[in-house]
Amino acid sequence: MKSAGVYPASNQEIYSGLVRIHILYHACQGPIFGLGMIEELRRHGYRLSAGTLYPLLHGLETKGYLRSREVRSGRTFRRFYRATAAGHKALALAREKVKELVGELLEDD
């Protein structure tokens, strides 16, 4: 995951998982598109390029968590992604795991 120097390279795999959860969350809320997700993730402190985000989106689609379709926008096309039933189920499971983890992390404080 390319992060423009914000995170050490050794943490990229960890942050990649968090980014995937963010993507699933927003795709469960409604249709998302690449640039919109880059901007949304930036609000949370992630610095992703299109070259990093699109492979993540395509990977989630290949695994059946997202479905996409192209929509014409003027002279160009924009690909929108939505969560599938499997994506909703995966997010529900991730939510439970994150709750459990946050509970453990906060116990140590």
Language model region names:
Residues 1-12:
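Short, Lys/Arg-enriched N-terminal segment that forms or immediately precedes the first helix
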Residues 11-52:
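N-terminal helix-turn-helix DNA-binding core of bacterial DNA-binding proteins
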Residues 53-55, 59-60:
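Basic amphipathic alpha-helical segments that dock to polyanions
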Residues 63-74, 82:
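Beta-hairpin "wing" of winged helix-turn-helix
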Residues 70, 75-78, 99-102:
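Histidine- and aromatic-rich ligand-binding microenvironments
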Residues 77-95:
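Basic, amphipathic "hinge/linker" alpha-helix immediately C-terminal to the N-terminal HTH DNA-binding motif
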Residues 91-109:
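Amphipathic alpha-helical dimerization/coiled-coil segments
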